[in-house]
């Protein structure tokens, strides 16, 4: 069982983030398995909430340092808005620094306002997620990987991504339906599926 941060009841869109570490430590002492944060680059008033405010990678490092063994997860990294090299290095760093604790959800994002801000096409987000996941696995599993695509060019034997994850891979849990990617694709390409809370009758149909 996991907890989505922040642990707080608040009015409006922006939490105060008061005493979060103490609350997370309490959650760990009660036997919860994990705490999760979200990847929300921009505050959009139309969505009326901003998650835990802080950058997910930095905040998870902060949490992991001040806890003992509770798992730390992102639900989920908005892959189309991030470069695979940055995601690969950040995720692998958490995996190595806090062994067997980091979990990574991946998503296409659901806030159209973010895409023009990053100069990314919203309508291509499902393709971007698929390409991004494949590239992450290459960057994690191979020494001196190469690529020549929309993300840029990395020639043979000129650069490597370090550190590598402990098992040369990090499971990726696909969130939602990723902008049109269906369940068959998720079953084939993802390591798990994270979905939004829904009524039981809806979940049963899935």
Where are these regions (language model features)?
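Active-site-adjacent structural elements that line small-molecule/cofactor binding pockets in enzymes
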Residues: 1-206
